[in-house]
């Protein structure tokens, strides 16, 4: 049985669900989920959780993410990226200094109106379904945080490569659109690569083709990282005896220690749960009791 985390370098033109469907077949495991959807045109870090490790997805989805994006000025489309229908084109007269000045206004806590071409729902219908019918509905601005927003290079008078570190729920397409609006010339995203998500980086990622090759050699499971690696930021503790018996039956137990979250291991070294100590009592935050170790 496959259990663990695999970081995929998502190829262009694949949906995030396409990747999960492919991995279900390669790993022979139906329980697969990903943390942080990437648009089809985007590439880069897609953390995929396999088997019992899918219990960790809810924690991974909320983390910050880092992207490298192409910002094309002088263009507006209905999708806010270069794949959409062109709505307007303008000449670009602003220089790099003007772009730098505008970027400053997008750093920190801001409000962002989600795009019509998105999977968000309004009255039970996904926005992109309405957009494809030519309909536009009011969307409420949502709070997001842009932790970092920098120009990596200017590729042409009307094109910049930018790096963004942001909170969950940020649409990079919309950020590019809004930057273009602020500059008065319009803007779209014409490339997107995620370099970090949920604490995982491109250096840890493998391609779908690498997974295919490993599966053909009967070694696909060797690409999986144990789920407890995601929780490495929390201190570890090992329990035994009565405490372990109570834990394995889903019960809390007395445990002296500093309040906070811990990785809890059994006497055999297996990862039992993410636990939390509160005033001398250990409780379960999320259990991983059925996870089998990946040798």
State each model region's role:
Residues 1-13, 17-34, 38, 42, ...:
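Accessory RNA 3′-end/elbow-binding domains used by RNA modification enzymes
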Residues 1-167, 172-204:
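Catalytic cores of RNA-modifying enzymes
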